């Protein structure tokens, strides 16, 4: 079962007004999400004297990221699709749902949105450190890599099922909620181990501002592999599967 056409895109696509508007929407949505997510961790650290790594800090991070992503996806959905994540964009590309050129434009916007968000946070908080993603004690690089693959697979699979699949019908209206919920749940599951990034842009901004690059590749490779697998599986086995409704009988 072939997937939809994977396309590079026309050379002028990167300068088309609709593509530029979509990229701007991705920039704004990612900025909103990172301010809420990273900002909540900084606020919790300030209020609890660096207690963001405690169980209550984990719950606070999960709630803030779930709510923040719900809003970020909602405000961008009708303009760019509300990806807010290079792994989601990559999964959409693997499934033939976005061209390579537009995907690169989205990536640039998402990364810039994250960096600008972290710079704003650092300035607005009077120079507080923006915490970068890192592995917890006793967690190996391979462990974190697998965790990021699995969690991002769940995220991108949810995006496909609720937002990309043309058969989703009314399910599409709850897509932002479902996407926010899966991210919040994954943070509760994996936050104590890898930090549960699931999003290269979310990891990139804090890494740039704090200039912390230890094991940073994990937060790119894991999500991209997981997102790509999810996009491929959903596109091949579900979107392109023809469905014939069972006959009904009146009694």
Curated annotation (Swiss-Prot):
Modified residues (N-acetylmethionine): 1
GO CC annotations on file: central vacuole; chloroplast envelope; plant-type vacuole; plant-type vacuole membrane; protein storage vacuole
UniProt KW keywords: Acetylation, Membrane, Repeat, Transmembrane, Transmembrane helix, Transport, Vacuole
Impact reported for residue 118 to T: Strongly reduces the mercury-sensitivity
Tissue expr: In all the vegetative organs, but not in seeds. Preferentially expressed in roots.
Cytoplasmic compartment spans: 1-23, 78-103, 165-172, 240-251
GO BP term, example: water transport
Motif segment (NPA 2): 199-201
Gene3D superfamilies, A to Z: Glycerol uptake facilitator protein (1.20.1080.10)
PANTHER family per UniProt: AQUAPORIN TIP1-1 (PTHR45665:SF54), AQUAPORIN-8 (PTHR45665)
Name this protein carries in UniProt: Aquaporin TIP1-1
Species of provenance: Arabidopsis thaliana (Mouse-ear cress)
Lineage: Eukaryota, Viridiplantae, Streptophyta, Embryophyta, Tracheophyta
């Amino acid at each position: 079962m072939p997937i939809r056409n994977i396309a590079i895109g026309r050379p002028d696509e990167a300068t088309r007004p609709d593509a530029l508007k979509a990229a701007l929407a991705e920039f704004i949505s990612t900025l909103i999400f990172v301010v809420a997510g990273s900002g909540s961790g900084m606020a919790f650290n300030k209020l609890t004297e660096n207690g963001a790594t405690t169980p209550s800090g984990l719950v606070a991070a999960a709630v803030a990221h779930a709510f923040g992503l719900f809003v970020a996806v909602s405000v961008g959905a009708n303009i760019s699709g509300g990806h807010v994540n290079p792994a989601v964009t990559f999964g959409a590309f693997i499934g033939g749902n976005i061209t390579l050129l537009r995907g690169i434009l989205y990536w640039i916007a998402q990364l810039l949105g994250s960096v600008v968000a972290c710079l704003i946070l650092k300035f607005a908080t009077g120079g507080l450190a923006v915490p970068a993603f890192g592995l917890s004690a006793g967690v190996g690089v391979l462990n974190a890599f697998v965790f990021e693959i699995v969690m991002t697979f769940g995220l991108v699979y949810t995006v496909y099922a609720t937002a990309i699949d043309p058969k989703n019908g009314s399910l599409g209206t709850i897509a932002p909620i479902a996407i926010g919920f899966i991210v919040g749940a994954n943070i509760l599951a994996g936050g104590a181990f890898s930090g549960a990034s699931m999003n290269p842009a979310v990891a990139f901004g804090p890494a740039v501002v704090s200039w912390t690059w230890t094991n940073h590749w994990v937060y790119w490779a894991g999500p991209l592999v997981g997102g790509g697998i999810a996009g491929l599986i959903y596109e091949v086995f579900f979107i392109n599967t023809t469905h014939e409704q069972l006959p009904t009988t009146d009694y």
